[in-house]
């Protein structure tokens, strides 16, 4: 280095670019730090380098670390841990004073294998600068001079800026971490998670939360966009009741799409920290609250609780308000925080008031006797078919539901928005009372046969629908409000009075657990009633109710593909104890998967709430990286085209951050070249052929397999399910498979509309089918 900084240069260094680099470096160093002495230590390894530094008698700052990776036998592959481990050894071996000056921006790693081609294979910011070893000595010399001078200027002239920044941990980060860690949770609930997308003003808060969360074992979950953070948080809340902290930078309050409304509707508990600009800012860059707009009005209009934190002296008061809203179960609480608040330092003890942190006592909402009596009469003595559609159930609620269903002959159904709340396979046994799905789409042939006779709903006094923990939104059933109010008897159980539907004949305002316990205690079902109900359930057929699921035409029909996948899953579940979490995006593929595939537990459905295409796909990383079983995702080409690629997120968190996949992740991308549900609607209503508005162009990649550390990622084509090893595909551990499934559009089956129940392919055709055909002539 001393030679490089000297006046004389070898002939090979007499290059204008090198001379200019050297001149500008000396111009700065000679006047900024006159008399600067540079000392160079060379060693064969990072361990011996640390020993040599410790033996040095001089006090110094560690300005630059240059590593010859190939000469040291270190691998520069980002998914190989040898190089970071070696640098950690160097840091650990340095004296404390020098360790404090050892930084990523002053460490340069050179390796012959670090060619442009190898760098292009996978690029990620590293805790050092990676360079290909230049072929020309002057390029290496100039690069070293730039690195050295950059470090000196940053260390010395940047000290004033660093002195002005906060010293100590972020008060907001410490308070939120402490608050969430002190909230009681059931054993089955997931730990709260940190989700963030970086930004300048929130970078310090994120860094502190990242460190604190990692120290307590809370998952840190990244995503390719702000929207993906909300999708992942929603999925974890619905599947595992896991609270969350989402952190985004200023101006990003509108980047969560309709998923924010879904978080509100799900009563998801968590905080969304969104940076704000200083109050005095004039038309700020990426502003949130300023003269031109006030995002608080948008949040208020959406019914999203928020707290504006703009004074470091009043953070505790603002947090007390935020904690009260968290405990109120109104959905996520927005914290709009100015830079002064984000930069404020402090401890959780200083900010978290005991009365605000502890959740208030909440008595269970008991069922009233006058609400329970008509329900018990219906369950115990009326010879009625009973179908219960269940929302999300905890372990005790699930046990109560299944016990009541078995003892009272109650049919069970899950829904398009909450698939797997009840299911065919539970704890290794088949649930005889489960009749598959009831929903706006994806309603099963068994459910239809149970509720209908000769193509029409059975008489009102012969059956009743129970909706447990449901608002009975439009997506819950295929029936119109008129049908629900006039042709069906409805019992609805909800702990929120505002969710009780106007057409519920027996609205029960109570907690589900209290209701179920009361029903179970009052069970006294007449034997003849129980026998009749069980016979009614047994008479329904577990059938695809079409013929095209057997036809091996290419491209495949969705019916054919899902029938093969269903057979494989049934075998894996019943013979090998296979379990999985299903993730279902908005589209025909998600509908077909919900309707046709056996489930082993609750899944996440993009059909929930706003039914946003792409939500389910964006949630896959958060689900896959935090659950213990396999993950199967069903994503249409329309949904995939709307949102970012999740592959880098999965690879980064699994291979780089050590958040290993527990089992197998398979993402089925179902490609039929269009928005299939819209096309079915359009063709059914108008009889017209598909128009350009429903077309989706998919540019199919070749098949490939790549290794990233211990993680295998594959892309595979599935053109014929019968010729594909689906058994092997679903059981490859520590593997992410993106399977492009080539399909042809059709309008047949899968509960796409009530009219589909009159299609000619059904197992049984009611007279109504022929009457409608004759009337149309």
Q: Where are the language model's segments positioned?
A:
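Glycine-rich, anion-gripping cofactor-binding loops and their flanking helix/strand elements
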Residues: 71-73, 77-94, 227-230, 234-242, ...
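Glycine-rich, acidic loop regions that bind phosphate or pyrophosphate groups
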Residues: 115, 119-123, 274-315, 339-341, ...
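Conserved thiamine diphosphate
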Residues: 129, 242, 286-329, 444-451, ...
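Phosphate/pyrophosphate-binding active-site segments
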Residues: 148-172, 333, 480-585, 692, ...
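Conformationally flexible catalytic loops at phosphate/diphosphate-handling active centers
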Residues: 155-168, 217, 293, 299-302, ...
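N-terminal cofactor/phosphate-binding cores enriched in small/glycine residues
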Residues: 165-262
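Active-site diphosphate/adenylate-binding microenvironment
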Residues: 168-210, 538-627, 775-777
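Thiamine diphosphate
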Residues: 215, 279-291, 422-425, 591-777
């Amino acid at each position: 280095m001393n030679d490089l900084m000297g006046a004389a240069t070898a002939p090979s260094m007499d290059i204008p670019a090198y001379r200019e680099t050297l001149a500008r470096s000396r111009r700065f160093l000679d006047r900024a730090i006159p008399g600067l002495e540079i000392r160079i230590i060379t060693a064969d390894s990072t361990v011996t380098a640390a020993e040599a530094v410790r033996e040095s008698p001089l006090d110094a700052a560690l300005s630059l670390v240059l590593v010859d990776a190939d000469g040291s036998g270190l691998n520069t592959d980002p998914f190989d841990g040898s190089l970071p481990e070696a640098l950690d050894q160097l840091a650990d071996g340095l004296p404390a004073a020098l360790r404090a000056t050892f930084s990523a921006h002053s460490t340069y790693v050179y390796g012959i294998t670090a060619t442009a081609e190898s760098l292009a294979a996978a690029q990620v910011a590293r805790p050092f600068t990676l360079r290909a070893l230049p072929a020309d000595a002057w390029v290496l010399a100039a690069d070293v001079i730039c690195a050295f001078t950059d470090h000196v200027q940053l260390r010395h002239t940047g000290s004033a800026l660093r002195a002005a920044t906060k010293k100590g941990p972020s008060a907001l980060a410490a308070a939120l971490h402490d608050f969430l860690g002190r909230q009681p949770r059931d054993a089955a609930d997931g730990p709260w998670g940190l989700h963030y997308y970086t930004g300048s003003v929130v970078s310090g808060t994120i860094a502190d939360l990242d460190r604190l969360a990692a120290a307590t074992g809370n998952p840190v979950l990244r995503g390719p966009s702000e929207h993906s953070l909300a999708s992942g948080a929603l999925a974890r809340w619905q599947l595992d009741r896991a609270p969350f902290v989402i952190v985004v930078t200023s101006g990003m309050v509108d980047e969560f799409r309709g998923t924010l409304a879904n978080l509100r509707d799900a009563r998801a508990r968590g905080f969304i920290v969104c940076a704000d600009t200083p109050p005095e800012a004039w038309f700020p860059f990426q502003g949130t609250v300023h003269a031109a707009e006030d995002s608080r009005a948008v949040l208020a209009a959406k019914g999203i609780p928020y707290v504006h934190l703009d004074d470091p002296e009043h953070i505790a008061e603002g947090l007390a308000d935020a904690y009260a809203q968290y405990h109120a179960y109104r959905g996520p609480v927005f914290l709009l925080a100015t830079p002064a608040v984000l930069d404020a330092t402090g401890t959780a003890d200083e900010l978290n008031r005991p009365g605000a942190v502890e959740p208030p006592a909440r008595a269970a909402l008991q069922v009233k006797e006058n609400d329970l009596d008509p329900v018990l009469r219906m369950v115990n003595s009326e010879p009625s078919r009973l179908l219960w559609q269940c929302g999300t159930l905890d372990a005790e609620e699930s046990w109560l539901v299944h016990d009541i269903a078995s003892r009272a002959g109650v049919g069970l159904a899950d829904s398009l928005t909450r698939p797997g709340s009840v299911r065919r396979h539970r704890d290794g046994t088949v649930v005889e009372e489960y009749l598959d799905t009831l929903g706006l789409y994806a309603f099963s042939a068994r459910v239809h046969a149970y509720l209908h006779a000769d193509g029409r709903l059975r008489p009102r006094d012969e059956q009743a629908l129970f909706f447990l923990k449901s608002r009975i939104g439009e997506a819950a059933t295929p029936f119109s409000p008129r049908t629900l109010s006039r042709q069906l008897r409805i019992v609805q159980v909800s702990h929120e009075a505002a969710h009780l539907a106007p057409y519920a004949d027996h609205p029960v305002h109570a907690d589900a657990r209290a209701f179920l316990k009361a029903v179970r205690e009052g069970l006294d079902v007449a034997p003849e009633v129980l026998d009749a109900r069980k016979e009614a359930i047994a008479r329904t057929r577990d059938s695809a109710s079409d013929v095209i699921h057997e036809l091996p035409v290419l491209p495949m029909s969705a019916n054919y593909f899902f029938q093969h996948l269903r057979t494989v899953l049934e075998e894996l579940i019943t013979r090998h104890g296979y379990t999985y979490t299903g993730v279902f995006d908005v589209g025909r593929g998600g509908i077909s998967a919900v309707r046709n595939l056996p489930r082993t537990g609750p899944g996440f459905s993009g059909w929930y709430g706003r039914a946003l295409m792409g939500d389910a796909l964006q949630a896959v990383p958060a689900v896959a990286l935090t659950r213990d079983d396999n993950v199967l995702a069903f994503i249409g080409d329309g949904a995939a085209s709307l949102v970012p690629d999740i592959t880098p997120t999965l690879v980064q968190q699994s291979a780089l951050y050590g958040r290993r996949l527990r089992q197998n992740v398979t993402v089925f991308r179902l490609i039929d070249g269009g928005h299939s549900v819209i096309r079915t609607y359009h063709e059914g209503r108008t009889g017209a052929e598909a128009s350009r508005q429903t077309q989706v162009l998919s540019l199919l990649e070749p098949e490939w397999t790549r290794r990233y550390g211990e993680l295998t990622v594959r892309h595979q084509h599935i053109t014929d399910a019968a010729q594909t090893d689906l058994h092997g595909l679903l059981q490859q551990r520590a593997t992410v498979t993106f399977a492009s499934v080539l399909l042809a559009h059709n309008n047949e089956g899968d509960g796409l509309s009530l009219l589909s129940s009159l299609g000619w392919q059904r197992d049984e055709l009611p007279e109504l089918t022929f009457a409608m055909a004759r009337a149309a002539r």
